[in-house]
From Swiss-Prot:
Primary localization class, coarse: endoplasmic reticulum
GO CC terms, sorted: endoplasmic reticulum; endoplasmic reticulum membrane
Identification of the protein by name: Protein DMP7
Claim: Glycoprotein is one of the keywords in the record: no
Lineage, uppermost ranks: Eukaryota, Viridiplantae, Streptophyta, Embryophyta, Tracheophyta
Transmembrane segments: 37-57, 69-89, 129-149, 167-187
Recorded name of the encoding gene: DMP7
Length: 200
């Protein structure tokens, strides 16, 4: 009985696809672009921050000046790693193994030096000005994420004024909107360390 149902379903003609309206295409493109936002921040940097922040800030208490300095150092170090990881990329070698490298002005410098790239591949992986803009925006997004963290804000601003509170709530939102719009308009083509490699 079940086999008969399956064969009947398989034999039904598929309904013709209705062409998508302009609004549907825009919405689809927006959602597709939003998927690229996951590449904004290296997961390792964010995870390191989330693990170490409560420890270094003593759950936001920061009892000593050393705690505050260590918190500033952690935020700066993670932001710098977001900047640097923006210049990493990956490629599949002829055996299908993923190789990571650093984008340079002359192409991709594969970290273990096991493969040499063709001239066409070198051109594809060259460092561009847009990579620097992505790196700076990645740092800004990380600073916005860290400003939303209650441990950081309580540590660095234990008794904030009304003006400081306003800045701490609105600035990360503004940074997120501007950087998000930029990344949707100009998505990164790099698949760095911690980012998934597509079949392209």
């Amino acid at each position: 009985m079940e086999e008969t149902k399956q064969s009947l379903i398989a034999s039904l003609p598929s309904a013709p696809r209705k062409p998508k309206s302009k609004v549907e295409r825009v919405v689809r493109k927006t959602f597709k672009g939003t998927a690229h936002l996951s590449n904004l921040l290296p997961t390792g940097s964010v995870m390191s921050f989330q693990i170490m922040c409560p420890v270094l800030t003593h759950q936001g208490q920061c009892p000593t000046i050393t705690s505050r300095w260590l918190t500033c150092f952690l935020v700066s170090l993670c932001a710098i790693s977001c900047f640097l990881f923006s210049f990493t990329d990956s490629i599949r070698d002829p055996n299908g193994k993923v190789r990571y490298g650093l984008a340079t002005w002359s192409g991709l410098l594969v970290m273990d030096g096991s493969i040499t790239l063709t001239e066409e591949e070198k051109e594809k992986y060259k460092l561009k000005i847009l990579d620097f803009i992505h790196a700076i925006m990645s740092m800004l997004v990380f600073f916005a994420v860290s400003m939303f963290d209650q441990n950081v804000t309580r540590c660095l601003f234990p008794v904030p004024s009304e003006e400081t509170k306003e800045i701490l709530t609105s600035l990360p939102f503004v940074i997120g909107v501007i950087c998000g719009a930029f990344f949707l308009a100009f998505p990164t083509r790099r698949h760095g360390i911690g980012s998934p490699l597509t079949k392209e």
